[in-house]
């Protein structure tokens, strides 16, 4: 099943918000605390796996617009800064129990979670 993920913060760095979209439903999180856009994207990817697990899915395609996070999650990044290695390890641990997890890049305009994250009410309060 396809699952879109996106994360952001305002200002950058600032309070992180994430969105996950699948099956016509949207999940938002506003409780991650502070970080930058890269932290937000990684946390959104981890949220996407948590949603998939909660729905009982076993074969997922995770779609995000952060090239850096997609490449790092797929193990294809040439260089991973030390601060992102924990996210990488958490992602690998979170994939346990799934039959198949694929991570793919999509353009921003095609990221349904990104579109959901742009809703103004997400950024209030």
Task: Give the positions of each predicted feature.
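Short intrinsically disordered terminal tails
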Residues: 1, 123-125
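RNase H-like nuclease fold core
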Residues: 1-39, 50-54
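RNase H catalytic domain
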Residues: 8-13, 46-118, 124
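Active-site beta-loop-alpha junctions of metal-dependent nucleic acid enzymes
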Residues: 34-41, 80, 84
């Amino acid at each position: 099943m396809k699952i879109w993920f996106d994360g952001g913060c305002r200002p950058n760095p600032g309070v992180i918000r994430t969105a996950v979209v699948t099956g016509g439903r949207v999940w938002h999180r506003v409780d991650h605390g502070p970080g930058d856009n890269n932290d937000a994207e990684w946390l959104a990817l981890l949220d996407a796996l948590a949603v998939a697990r909660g729905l009982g899915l076993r074969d997922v395609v995770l779609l995000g617009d952060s090239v850096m996070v997609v490449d790092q999650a797929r193990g294809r990044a040439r260089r991973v800064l030390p601060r992102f290695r924990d996210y990488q390890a958490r992602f690998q641990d979170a994939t346990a129990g799934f039959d198949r997890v694929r991570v793919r890049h999509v353009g921003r305009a095609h990221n349904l979670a990104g579109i959901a994250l742009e809703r103004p009410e997400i950024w209030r309060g």
